[in-house]
């Protein structure tokens, strides 16, 4: 009723970070593109994105542990927010700027709160400070905990960190090359060359961490067949180098490829890009499957393109996408939902955006300059590098 509306209106006008959709009115042009997004009743044009202050970092951990869930037996601890690297596909790396590693003393106090839980997972977009990670791992070992990571940077595997990981009994490490070719890694601003990646996997094997998981994406902007084939070539090269070490140890681990379809995300330099079509993604997956079919000790897992399409629809659409959600719930099928709703989902998923197009997420105040994201997109098309964030020094993106 009117009482509830008035209360929401009052809260939205006073509290940063509060978005009430009914108080913002979208307008569309003849082509169906968003042309305006206006607040009503005097509310701010932009809704500020709230960030976690360092003092609240102690709250960034698993609160409820329940069985029969993905991490039901593992206590997850966030070790920082944001990332300095600037990978152009990564939403978390941009929307959580500036990068903020949590103080070690706070993380150690959270570890103490894990109680009798044996397994601890360290989570973060950027796990880069090898010295800090080494000390945190030693603290976990001292308290009798098993440790795992979301992934580790190939250029951060120091001998000291590797020795600590071995002591911790780690059997598997995940590294994310993300693209197979040097060129495409420059496009996405990954900042890792092939030599660094291969040498990192060799060092892991030398320290008896023999199981390796590699993250790759297909469908990245400017990707050609040669870039997809490079995933196969890089995997074979890594295996060849590891095999020489494993022969001396008389045991071989497993290399597992996790291959996901690239989905263009809001607030990244690739927010203007059209998603690759499903048939193309399926063909690229086949290239990798066939290329590694006869490689022993190499396993491949693939994202399902049709579900990546759903993810892109939800990520890139505006409030009209709610009609697809309702139809999918009613029919029990996304395929039926696409037919039932009088909108073409390709409009949101497969359409390249115009330079000055208004996006449904532009009203969120992340502090990032949209022109900066466009400049990064243009640098991507030229495969040009951007240096990592220099917090408090550089002013390039507008956040600091």
Regions found by a protein language model. Give the residues of each.
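Glycine- and acidic
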Residues: 72-76, 88-97, 117-123, 180-187, ...
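Glycine-rich beta-alpha loop elements in corrinoid/cobalamin-binding modules
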Residues: 1-38, 266-318, 325-333
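Short glycine/threonine-rich loop-to-helix capping motif typified by GTGT followed
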Residues: 130-136, 162, 222-231, 266-277, ...
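A glycine-rich phosphate-binding loop feature that marks nucleotide/adenosyl-phosphate handling sites
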Residues: 10-22, 125-130, 152-157, 217-219, ...
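C-terminal amphipathic alpha-helical interaction region
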Residues: 363, 382-400
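Conserved SAM/AdoMet-binding glycine-rich loop
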Residues: 108-256
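Structured core elements
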Residues: 19, 57-59, 65-66, 75-82, ...
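Acidic, low-complexity intrinsically disordered segments
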Residues: 1-105, 324-330, 334-364, 368-379
